[in-house]
Structure formats: structure tokens, C-alpha cells
Amino acid sequence: MMRRIIENSHGHPLKNQKILQSKELSCIACSQGKLIIRPSPAKMEVKPPTFLERIHGDICGPINPPSGPFRYFMVLIDASSKWSHVCLLSSRNLAFARLLAQIIKLRAQFPDYTIKNIRVDNAGEFTSQAFNNYCMSTGINIEHPVAHVHTQNCLAESFIKHLQLIARPLLMREKIPLSIWGHAILHAASLIRIRPTSYHKYSPTQLAYGQEPDISHL
């Protein structure tokens, strides 16, 4: 730009020269190169979901090195209380059985609350006919985000990042082998459940069970 001004001026004062306006300087390629993917707009809820009304789930892995026989971990998090369940998996094929077992356990522990919606990714273990048939028989609505649009399941994915941000420093501080990540992830999950969140002044455990969590073991 400065070179063009100098060449066009031929040594004459700039006040006699035409100055290009900003709209004449726009570079389409530069603008396109700086584009970013905006987060998907949050769906406006008429009212906040009740406990267990909406559960988000996701699987992280494969992780190398494995933690014993485990190479994955699965998270389930309640959209209302942020209460969570984390389990280690040796294979993604076990996700359906673990999810089914947790649903049965939650329905037995909290008979006054109904699981209405489960949002999970499009992995084969969550799109199988067996999983669809079970959810249909129990009145659970399955929600799948658009493929490769991770922001549509951001609650589960952000929870996974939260776990990792706690587990990694634990491993580094204690200078223990990375293969112990499974224990670190489970410990991080237990710490998150007993701490108040940015959404509530109470911990997820207190919101779920109605009493303060026991922290005597810490």
C-alpha cells in the first residue's frame, strides 16, 4: 500500500493524491482465511431441565499408554445438577452395556425422577438397534449431534476436558507412570462431584442426594 502511494505521488505532496478508502482495500482471501467456526447457538430452554431429565454422554480414547486393560473412559453428566458418572472401558464395544447398567442404577436410586433425554455421539455403540429398542421401550429420547459438530455435545466434551485438566497435574505432581491415568481420571471425577460448580452454589452430589458429601477421606 505504501509503495503504491509513493509511486503514484511522484514526489508531489500526498494531499493532492487520491487516498484509497478502506472499502477499496478489502482482501477477500484475507477475510476468508481468518474465518473461525462459531459455536452452535445454544438451544433456548423454556425452563431449566429437572434432575435426570437430560443426560449427556461421550467416550474419550483410545489413550496411549493403556491403564491396565483400559484404553477409554466414558462420561455421563446430568444437565441440571452436573452430577456425573465416569467409568473405564477396555473397548468401545462395552459402552452400551455400561450405559445400560448406569441407566438401570439411576432409575432404581431415584425412582421419583425420569430420564427423558440422552444426548450421545454418533458412534456405533450408541446407534445400534439394541440401544434404540431399549430406549424406545423405556420412553427415553435419544439425541445425536450433527457429525463433526462437537459443540452440539459440548457439556460432555467440556467435562472430559475438565477431567483431563485435573488428572494431568495429579500425575505430574506425584511423578507416577502415565499408565496410572485411569485412577487419576476416576479421582478427578470424585473431586468434581463434591465441589460446587459455576452453575450452583452446591456440589453435584449434594444436589443429587440432598446431603453434603463426605470428604473425610481426602
Task: Describe every region a protein language model picked out.
Residues 1-218:
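HHCC-type zinc-binding knuckle of retroelement integrases
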